[in-house]
Each structure stands twice: as structure tokens, then as C-alpha cells.
A protein has these predicted regions:
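A conserved mid-protein helix/loop that constitutes part of the nucleotide-sugar donor-binding site
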Residues: 1-6, 174, 178-197, 207, ...
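N-terminal strand-loop element at the rim of the active site
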Residues: 1-43, 126-129, 214, 392-406
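Short hydrophobic beta-strand element within catalytic cores of glycosyltransferases
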Residues: 17-18, 273-276, 286, 627-629, ...
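Short His-centered aromatic/hydrophobic patch
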Residues: 63-69, 87
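A short helix/loop element that forms part of the nucleotide-sugar donor recognition site in Leloir-type
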Residues: 153-169, 527-541
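Aromatic "clamp/platform" in nucleotide-sugar-dependent glycosyltransferases that forms part
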Residues: 237, 256
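Conserved acidic donor-binding segment of nucleotide-sugar-dependent glycosyltransferases
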Residues: 288-289, 293-300, 309-314, 665-671
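Active-site anion-handling motifs in enzyme catalytic cores
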Residues: 350-716
Length: 716
């Protein structure tokens, strides 16, 4: 924190208030940070802090820690400036094992956090934790602790440092180190157990424990019970952490909960590989097998395997140490943290002072359809490319699900008064993506979406129909109403396919800016192949087999066509070795159609479990050899991964998109086994060709006009 404050003072005036004189305040003064200490109890500190803010020309009050949070919460009503707090740890776990403290200090801290205008969360995982507990996503900013890479390495040998602390480990020891306070949430006992198992397989292993706390006696007793007392050294509180990290070979973290601990970045600065529990923001830096090793909390046997793998392979230790150093220097330096904090301050002040900012998105979200959720992921991600802290509010059928799944603020569709308030505060209203302007599934939904467009314009928003599809519009009244509303209210339209453009002209849309771009999902990158394979393997699906992905849906006449599809799948397995893998996009509706297709089929098949993770699903489809789909977004996922595809069109939107993507498409009523086989063979013959790659790249480039249009409408 002091390094961050020192860096901030190179750009802004930042004063530090402490409530007790201690080493922290002394160090701050030595670093040149303007520091005041208000001792004398809570009320004295509260009064002096209020006087300081009243007499100072401050733009923001930034609180760190439970006492500061409570002070800020009580003072907030007296000042017209934003109050923010940095959430370093889970307030529900801060007093784990201390029920009285949790009932008093813990509850007061919780209430104080709710009173803040904004919260800075140390890691995306901590931000997600607060979202799950009801905090407004648009008021939460993620940040990651940085480390100062400019500090020189300590001029001390391991032997000298061991002598200073009274440790007599042999010179050739492989030292595992853990630096943590001894309380339940840090779970140092798992490290002790994990080390004990590893020590049985490598006699050179030693464990150095730096820290103090209520669990010390328990930990010492555990070492004795495991018969490793002669291989463990308790160093107590360590002031020279540079010397500590220069003296260990493997850094250990076994916490049950973390944000983004300094222990992981300090070890990275020293070039030491880390073995850590998969909690909080740790996986942002520690990528399993690439920059360190991860295990699940409490799993001391997995920790044993990780420690042994590193202890028995010096080359691997050096490789992971170099990799984590490079990644930390690139992404987690003090300078990058300082820039991030300054950006948060700028955003907070702008929001506090400007009457309008951000975007409201309205679409078919919260219905449980993976395709629509992928659209929201894509649109939000593109908006974040303009400003990573952009205020985004989503109109959703299931606002709670949208908040938790996407990390975005959301309101229910029937909350009209709340929608009006949000529109008055926003610059841009996005209608889309997807096929919202159609009256096949429901006329009422069409009228709802047209009403929201009209409402947005009435309340001063610029309006964009974003990467959307148009039609079908079967009723004359709906066609007239759609054209009238769009012409009156919409500033720009970006369409996902040429058929939609034809319909806009047909119904009389005269908006000047109408572009054919593409579906926003096309530019989702997807997660890594390693993530996809790990997910498949964890659900009993061998990722190295060859698969044909099936994105089907129930539709009138499906039962009659299931035999044709079954015969084609049997052929693809017999002749091509392709195992059918069913991937339901709307799990509640699509999963049941697997049974009539597979009934009597001798080919093996697999069914993808529900994920609610569009980026993971794209990565999984990328592993496929072929995609056969009725669901539009199954075809789009395949296009993202440049996988050969066959469309089975039950709706003009599928035909239009398939034509735009250059994908072969069969009208659903015309599906026969032989036609499906012939079309699949033709698609497979294109696999890996330059033409396929060029076609998809062209369309992805065109799709980028969706966000460029939004950027211009936002005035960015």
C-alpha cells in the first residue's frame, strides 16, 4: 500500500491518515508520504478526520480497513464528494474463529461497505463475491496488487539470512516457504500436511514458516504429530521479506480465501515458483503448469504432488520461476497498479460530476438461452474495450442471474420506473443483439422492445440497434409500427446479415446509417484449448477423440426428421470416426431431443453439460471437426473457431446468417439423411483451407463496425 501511495503522489496529492502511531506510519513518512496520525480513540479520530476533510480541498475520500470504513460511512453524509473503500479481504472471513468479533466488528464493517459510493476490489474474484452478496456491479472496480520491480535484490546469501534468524537448514536444502498469519482463513495446516507428504519423497525438503498468530501451538503440535519437526522452522514475524524470498525455493499459499495476496507477487519478483490454492485472484498470475501450480483448497494430497513435482525437477522450478517473473513484471508492477488506481479515481469523479454516462442494453437476456447470453458477453466485452470501467446496465428477465453471471448491473423488465431513471443517467441505449424485431414467437415481445427504444429516445439517449437481426414481421400493423418507431428514435442500425437489410428497406426504414456488420459473438475469442480439454475431461468426455458438434432444438416436425439425422450421424461415425456430441444451447428445452435421435443408434455419443460460459463453449466447439446446427449461435461458435459447419434452418435468421457466413444450409423441412451426409462431406472438404480462414476473417473484421458505431455515438 505504501508503494502505491508513493506512486500516486507523483501524479496527485494524496494524504494518509492513520489512527495509531506505528511502523506503518513511520515508514510512510520516510517515503515522503504526507501522513497524519489521529490517536485517542474512535470518537477523537472521527472528529479530527471530519475537520481535516472540511479544511482540505479533497476530491475523494478513500478508506482502507474496517475502522476507516466505519469512519467514512459516518462522515459521508456531511460531504458532497465520493467515498470509496478498498476491499482487501472477505469481511465474512476476516474474523473466522472469533464469533464475537465477527458479530461486532464484522457486522459494522459490512454495513460501512454498503454505505460507500464505490468499492475497489482486490481481484476479480473479490468483486464477484461482493456481487453475489448484493453489491451493485457498476459500483465495484477490480484492481490487483502490484510489486516494485525497481528494488535491488538483497545483498545477502541464504546462509547469512538463515544465520540471522537462527535457522540451521543444510546448505543443499530445497526450502518451501509460507508467509502468513496463523489463523483459520490462511489454513497453514494444509501446507504443513502437504509438505509432510512431499518430504517422504524427497529428503532434502525443508519448510520455513514466517508469521505468528493464534494457531501457532496447533501448527507446532501438527508438525510433531507428522514427525517433521526437525524439517520445519518457525521464523516468527519476518521484517526482511526480500531476504526471506531470496532464501526459499518454492513459495506456498494454502488460503481458503484471498483477494490477490502480496505473497504471490513478491515471490514472482524474486523469480520463485508458487504452489497455491485456487482461490481469489491467484489464478490471474499463477496459471497451472505455466507460471506455477494450483490445487483446490484443503487438498493437502494435491499440494504434496505439486511440491514434489517442483522439488524433484530443478529445471521445472527455474522455468516456472522465469515465467511468473515475466508475467508479473508485465502485468502486476507497482506502476500498473498505480495507473489502474488513478484511472478508478478519474472514473469516480467523472461519474459523480457528470449527469450522463454509460450504456443501457436491452435484449432477450435472462431467459436461459446460451446464445443470447453469449451476445451479452460479446457486447459488454466490446463496450469494455472502449472503457474497462464503463457503466453498463442490462434489462433482463432474470436480473439476479445476469448480475451474477456477467458481473453487470441489471434491472428486471417490468421495473419501468427504474428503467426510466437509468435512461436519464445514460448516454447510449443499445437494442440487441439478436432477433428482437420479429413477431413470430410473440407480438408482445416486439411491442416491448419497440417501447423501450421509444422510451430511451424520450429520455435523451442516443439509440443503436446493435448487430441485430430483423424479422420475420408477418402482421401489417407490426411492420408499420416497427418502421415508425425505428425512423423516429434510432440513430444507427448495425445488422448481422443481408436478409435483415432487405427487410428494413421493405418495411420502409429510412434511418440514414444502416450497416451490415455481423453478429457480435463472432469476435469472442473463447478460452484456451487447455481449459476446454480440461472441462471435457472432467465430465468424462475424452478431448482427443474426433467429434461432430450438434446444436439442435425442438421444433414442429422434429420427431419426423430425427431418423434422418440419426442415419447421417451413424454414417459420419462409421466413415469418418466422428462421435456425436450434443451441445444444448437452451438446456431446459434442448436436452430432451437427444433421446429420439440416439434411440437405436449404435454410434457412441456424448452430451455436453450445462456451462453458462460462452467463452468456454466457443473453446469446446473449436475442438470439433464438424458442427451441424439448427441453433444460430452454434453456427456462430463454429465460425469463431473456423470449424466447418452445416446449418439446418428452421427460421429465416438461420438462413440469412448461414448465407452471410458462407455456410451450407438445408431448410429443415428438406432434411434427408443423404442430403445431410453430402452437405457434411462438402463442409469437411473445406476444413483447414485458406478460403475458409479468409471468409471468416473478413466477416470478423466487418463485425467490428458494431462497436465502432457505438464508440462514435458515445462521443468517445
Amino acid at each position: 500500500m505504501l508503494s502505491l501511495l508513493h506512486g500516486l503522489n507523483e501524479h496527485i496529492d494524496a494524504d494518509l491518515v492513520c489512527y495509531m502511531e506505528a511502523e506503518f506510519s513511520e515508514s510512510a513518512r520516510e517515503m515522503g508520504i504526507p501522513t497524519q496520525v489521529f490517536e485517542g480513540g474512535f470518537n477523537v479520530g472521527l472528529k479530527k478526520t471530519r475537520e481535516l476533510i472540511e479544511n482540505g480541498d479533497y476530491d475523494i475520500v478513500h478508506c482502507h480497513g474496517s475502522r476507516a470504513n466505519l469512519t467514512g460511512a459516518l462522515l459521508k453524509k456531511h460531504f458532497d464528494i465520493p467515498f470509496i473503500s478498498t476491499v482487501h479481504s472477505d469481511y465474512k472471513l476476516d474474523y473466522l474463529g472469533r464469533p464475537m468479533a465477527a458479530m461486532t466488528y464484522g457486522q459494522l464493517n459490512k454495513l460501512a461497505l454498503h454505505r460507500m459510493d464505490y468499492r475497489v476490489c482486490v481481484s476479480d474474484q473479490m468483486r464477484q463475491t461482493l456481487i453475489d452478496r448484493g453489491f451493485e456491479p457498476s459500483e465495484l472496480f477490480p484492481i490487483y496488487n502490484g510489486v516494485d520491480f525497481s528494488r535491488p535484490k538483497p545483498d545477502i546469501t541464504r546462509r547469512e539470512w538463515f544465520c540471522d534468524i537462527g535457522c540451521d537448514f543444510p546448505e543443499d536444502s530445497i526450502v518451501v516457504g509460507i508467509a502468513a498469519r496463523f489463523d483459520a482463513v490462511k489454513d497453514v495446516a494444509t501446507t504443513v500436511r502437504g509438505f509432510a507428504g512431499a518430504a517422504e519423497g524427497n529428503d532434502r525438503l525443508r519448510l520455513l514458516i514466517a508469521g505468528e498468530g493464534r494457531e501457532r501451538e496447533m501448527l507446532e503440535a501438527l508438525c510433531a504429530e507428522l514427525d517433521i519437526r526437525d524439517k520445519v522452522f518457525f521464523a516468527g514475524w519476518v521484517n526482511d521479506m526480500d531476504g526471506y524470498y531470496a532464501s526459499v525455493d518454492i513459495n506456498a499459499i494454502s488460503s481458503l480465501s484471498e483477494t490477490f495476496p502480496y505473497a504471490v507477487t513478491e515471490a514472482a519478483r524474486a523469480g520463485i515458483p508458487t504452489v497455491a490454492s485456487r482461490v481469489g485472484g491467484i489464478p490471474r498470475l499463477i496459471i497451472n503448469g505455466e507460471t506455477g501450480m494450483l490445487f483446490e483448497p484443503h487438498d493437502h494430497e494435491a499440494m504434496t504432488r505439486c511440491i514434489l513435482a517442483l522439488a524433484n525437477d530443478e529445471v521445472l522450478r527455474k522455468k516456472l520461476g522465469r515465467a511468473v517473473y515475466d508475467k508479473a513484471r508485465r502485468e502486476f508492477s507497482t506502476e500498473s497498479t498505480c495507473r489502474r488506481q488513478l484511472k478508478i479515481y478519474k472514473t469516480v469523479i467523472e461519474r459523480y460530476n457528470e449527469p450522463r454516462c454509460g450504456v443501457v442494453i436491452c435484449g432477450a437476456y435472462g431467459h436461459g438461452n446460451a446464445g443470447d447470453e453469449a451476445l451479452l458477453t460479446a457486447i459488454a466485452g466490446q463496450l469494455r474495450s472502449i472503457d474497462e470501467d464503463m457503466r453498463i446496465v442490462v434489462v433482463s428477465k432474470n436480473a439476479r442471474h445476469t448480475r451474477r453471471t456477467h458481473g453487470l448491473s441489471a434491472i428486471r423488465r417490468w421495473q419501468v420506473l427504474r428503467l426510466r431513471r437509468e435512461l436519464k443517467r445514460s448516454k447510449l441505449f443499445i437494442s440487441g443483439g439478436g432477433s428482437l424485431i420479429q413477431d413470430v414467437t410473440s407480438r408482445r415481445s416486439l411491442w416491448f422492445y419497440l417501447h423501450t427504444i421509444s422510451l430511451a429516445k424520450k429520455h435523451g439517449c442516443r439509440v443503436q440497434m446493435y448487430g441485430c437481426g430483423m424479422g420475420p414481421l408477418n402482421y401489417d400493423y407490426d411492420r408499420r409500427r416497427a418502421a415508425e418507431t425505428i425512423n423516429r428514435c434510432v440513430d444507427a442500425i448495425t445488422l448481422r446479415d443481408p436478409l435483415s437489410l432487405e427487410l428494413t428497406r421493405e418495411i420502409g426504414v429510412t434511418v440514414q446509417e444502416v450497416l451490415v456488420t455481423g453478429d457480435p459473438v463472432l469476435n469472442l475469442r473463447g478460452r484456451s484449448d487447455a481449459d476446454a480439454k480440461a472441462f471435457l475431461r472432467s465430465h468424462g468426455i475424452e478431448p482427443n477423440e474426433k467429434y461432430v458438434c450438434l446444436g439442435l432444438r425442438n421444433w414442429p416436425g422434429f420427431a419426423e426428421k430425427s431418423g434422418e439425422i440419426r442415419a447421417a450421424l451413424q454414417y459420419l461415425y462409421d466413415k469418418r470416426g466422428l462421435i456425436p456430441l450434443f451441445m444444448p444451447m437452451n438446456y431446459d428445452r434442448d436436452a430432451a431431443i437427444t433421446e429420439p435421435i440416439t434411440r437405436g443408434m449404435s454410434a457412441p455419443f456424448r452430451v455436453m453439460p450445462k456451462t453458462e460460459d460462452a467463452e468456454l463453449e466457443i473453446a469446446i466447439v473449436r475442438q470439433m471437426k464438424l458442427c451441424v446446427a439448427m441453433r444460430l449461435h452454434s453456427l456462430l461458435y463454429a465460425a469463431c473457431g473456423e470449424v466447418p459447419s452445416v446449418g439446418l434452418s428452421y427460421d429465416p435468421k438461420v438462413t440469412g446468417c448461414a448465407r452471410y457466413l458462407g455456410i451450407s444450409c438445408i431448410e429443415f423441412d428438406d432434411v434427408t439423411a443423404q442430403r445431410l451426409i453430402d452437405t457434411a462431406e462438402a463442409a469437411l472438404s473445406e476444413s483447414g483451407t485458406d478460403e475458409l480462414e479468409r471468409r471468416f476473417e473478413y466477416i470478423k473484421n466487418a463485425e467490428r463496425m458494431n462497436i465502432e458505431t457505438a464508440r462514435r455515438l458515445l462521443g468517445e
